[in-house]
A protein has these predicted regions:
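A generic structural signal for well-ordered alpha-helical segments
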Residues: 3-4, 28, 72, 116, ...
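Catalytic core of bacterial c-di-GMP phosphodiesterases, primarily the EAL and HD-GYP domains
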Residues: 121-188, 263
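Short, flexible helix-to-coil linker/hinge segments that flank and couple to helix-turn-helix
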Residues: 1-5, 15-55
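Aromatic/hydrophobic pocket-lining residues that form π-stacking "cages" and hydrophobic walls in ligand
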Residues: 24, 112, 133, 248
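EAL-family c-di-GMP phosphodiesterase catalytic domain
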Residues: 88, 101-104, 152, 175-184, ...
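Active-site core of bacterial EAL-family cyclic-dinucleotide phosphodiesterase domains
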Residues: 57-115, 282, 287-291
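C-di-GMP signaling machinery
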Residues: 45-78, 115-122, 294-306
Length: 306
């Protein structure tokens, strides 16, 4: 089916009507002595269906690219920050930079990221968002860090390396997300070594959500391990989740890493996380994502004082 004559290919390339494409393919198939007459029409239809699928996929990617390009050019997004609290001191230890898109269609950030990846623009979008967050670094209290979500391919790019050359790299945490499987961990680790030597810390997101995150932890030796929200949910009444959290804290202590619990929404969850030995946490109970405050709150959230 891959041996199309020039006539059929010409119709496909020019983008003529479906009937014209089908006729061209049919004539091509009829001209093949190896194709019986009774099969010419079915073969032509199958080829047309395949070609239409390719054209639809190409058009979809083009629309995705245009949407992402428009969002970047129009800056149709805003950076919000969610505080990460030290549960012992009750103070803000850091801020995670998150994104809210204002461009239509209204969709969650993970959909925009997936679309950017499909359109081949993940690097461009992630770097624009990272720069927008870094531009506000000086508004953070000097003793807090800024956590940026980057895919592995973006984090190791030359453009990201240049972007992260800030005055105090020890205040930057690169939170690795995974949109595609990592092909070579040794290469990734080596590529990240330059950032880490300058003081940038590495965090692994979604720990406990699946095998991929655990593989990240084992192969990349992170400074921070972020407990996935699926483990935080119901941890107050699930002995299995509690045991996993305790084990993760024990592992982190032995390798010199820190565990951060995500998605804390109730006081019972907070109590269970504390009981497991987790020192850092974030979630709607403690602070919702929003514009960066100009100064650290004078008082910690009431929930941390109990």
């Amino acid at each position: 089916m891959t041996m199309l004559r020039a006539g059929a290919v010409g119709y496909v390339v020019k983008g003529d009507s479906t009937d014209e494409i089908l006729s061209a393919i049919y004539r091509t198939v009829q001209g093949k002595s190896s194709v019986p007459e009774r099969l010419a029409a079915p073969v032509a239809s199958a080829m047309l269906e395949h070609i239409q699928g390719l054209r639809d996929a190409t058009r979809t990617r083009q629309l995705q690219r245009e949407r992402v390009e428009r969002a970047i050019e129009d800056r149709a997004f805003r950076i919000v920050f969610q505080p990460i609290f030290d549960l012992e001191s009750g103070k803000v230890a850091g801020m995670e930079a998150l994104t809210r898109f204002s461009d239509l269609p209204e969709r969650p950030p993970n959909v925009w990221i997936a679309e950017a990846e499909a359109a081949g623009m993940l690097l461009d979008l992630e770097l624009v968002l990272a720069k927008a967050a870094l531009d506000q670094l000086e508004d953070l209290p000097s003793d807090t860090f800024l956590s940026l979500n980057l895919s592995p391919e973006t984090a190791v790019s030359d453009r990201a390396q240049r972007l992260l050359e800030v005055a105090d790299p020890s205040r930057i945490v690169v939170e690795l997300t995974e949109h595609a499987p990592v092909a070579d961990y040794d290469e990734l680790r080596e590529s990240l070594s330059g950032l880490r030597e300058r003081g940038v810390r590495l965090a692994i997101d979604d720990a406990g959500a699946g095998f991929a995150s655990l593989r990240h932890i084992v192969r990349l030796d992170p400074d921070m391990i972020k407990l996935d929200i699926t483990l935080t949910r119901r941890i107050e009444r699930d002995p299995v989740r509690q045991a996993l959290a305790v084990a993760l804290v024990s592992f982190a202590n032995q390798v010199g890493a820190t565990v951060v619990a995500e998605g804390v929404e109730t006081e019972l969850q907070l109590e269970a996380l504390r009981a497991a030995g987790i020192r850092f946490a974030q979630g709607f109970l403690l602070g919702s994502p929003g514009p960066l405050p100009t100064a650290e709150p004078d008082q910690p959230p009431e929930e941390l004082c109990r």
